[in-house]
């Protein structure tokens, strides 16, 4: 399995541009002698999903194993070659090591072992490697719109959870705000309408609207002003400004209702400041995720973890979004996140993964698929 991981880490799928078709082809070939159905779903521009299925004895209630094929860009600050896997002190270093080609290798290796065992599972086991998770989620959307979720009861996504049982994930809204005010001399700010001040003030109002309440696995919702631009000159009050906010929501939050409240707050601010105009647009919308407490697979994973490793499996939640939020727009199913990677190392220089954690994740996944 570690050899498989090494080979996948050496395939460049930085997004942009993605080029996931290369890795999808590799996985398709890896399963070529495996007794399973397999296909490639082309989504254009050198990008593709790869899907495989082990047919079960009974229809419905399929288990889907999911992982994304792309990685974020390498970035600077590396002490190793990010596109060449390097083993050191029991860890593998490369872009995608934690997020999430290690999880991809675990699910792929366990899937092929299960297919080659000749033991037919009770229900279908589906493997889905998706493109573009790190950007727009187009791969997951294409997979869902092709009807490939129609018989799926549970999706196990091999995102980095440090071997924890991921039962919840924050939702995400990227909100673009644009303000038009009135310029004037910087010495007489009272004569103008400061667009930058208006957007920073709105950001505070949004933060108050979003926050409040906590989740046992996720903590608090957050609203962070991450980008702002505006102004022409240091001695001129800016009449134009644009900002971006990263909003992370908790399970139970309806994004449509939340955006409606934010628009109302912006309208109230404009009413209180004649001449001010504010425009809002949603750039990314990923719903929060929470696994049902009585999920059969979640309960069985906990039991197997204790049996295999003689310790309880920790429950965890993730602040980042995944393809789970896309899938749940199309199917009412349970989503569990589990993988050997560490979320703290995702998207960082010198990203790495523990080889021991990969082997433990494989043992658990292998045991789970024997009972699927």
Language model region names:
Residues 1-95, 116-121, 303, 332, ...:
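Acidic/His- and Gly-rich active-site-bordering loop/insert found
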Residues 88-90, 110-126, 151, 206-216, ...:
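Phosphate-handling active-site elements
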Residues 91-105, 185:
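Glycine/serine-rich anion-binding loops at beta->alpha junctions
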Residues 100-174:
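Acidic/histidine-rich catalytic neighborhood of metal-dependent amide-processing enzymes
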């Amino acid at each position: 399995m570690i050899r498989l991981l090494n080979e996948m880490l050496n395939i460049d799928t930085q997004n942009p541009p993605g080029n996931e078709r290369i890795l999808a082809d590799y996985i398709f070939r890896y399963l070529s002698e495996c007794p399973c159905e397999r296909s490639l779903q082309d989504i254009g521009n050198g990008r593709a999903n790869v899907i495989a299925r082990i047919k079960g004895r009974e229809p419905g209630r399929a288990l889907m194993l999911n992982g994304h094929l792309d990685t974020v860009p390498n970035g600077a600050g590396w002490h190793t070659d990010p596109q060449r896997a390097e083993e050191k002190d029991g860890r593998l270093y490369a872009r995608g090591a934690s997020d999430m080609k290690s999880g991809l290798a675990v699910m792929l290796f366990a899937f092929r072992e299960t297919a080659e065992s000749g033991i037919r599972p009770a229900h279908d086991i589906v493997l889905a490697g998706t493109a573009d998770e790190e950007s727009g989620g187009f791969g997951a959307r294409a997979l869902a719109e092709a009807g490939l979720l129609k018989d799926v009861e549970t999706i196990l996504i091999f995102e980095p959870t440090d071997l924890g049982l991921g039962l919840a994930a924050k939702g995400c809204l990227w909100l673009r705000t644009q303000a038009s005010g009135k310029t004037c001399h910087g010495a007489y700010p009272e004569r103008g309408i400061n667009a930058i001040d208006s957007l920073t003030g709105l950001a505070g109002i949004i933060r108050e609207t979003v926050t409040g309440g906590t989740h046992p696995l996720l903590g608090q919702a957050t609203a962070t002003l991450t980008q702002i631009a505006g102004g022409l000159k240091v001695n001129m009050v800016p009449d134009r400004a644009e900002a971006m906010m990263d909003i992370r929501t908790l399970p139970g939050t309806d994004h449509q209702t939340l955006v409606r409240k934010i628009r109302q707050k912006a309208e109230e601010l404009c009413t209180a400041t004649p001449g001010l105009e504010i425009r809002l647009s949603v750039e990314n919308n990923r719903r929060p995720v929470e696994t049902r407490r009585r999920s059969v697979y979640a309960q069985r994973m906990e039991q197997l973890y204790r049996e295999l490793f003689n310790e309880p499996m920790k429950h965890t939640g993730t602040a980042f979004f995944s393809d789970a939020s896309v899938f749940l727009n199309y199917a009412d199913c349970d989503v569990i996140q589990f993988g050997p990677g560490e979320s703290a190392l995702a998207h960082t220089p010198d990203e790495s993964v523990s080889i021991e954690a990969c082997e433990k994740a494989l043992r658990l996944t292998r045991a789970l698929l024997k009972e699927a």
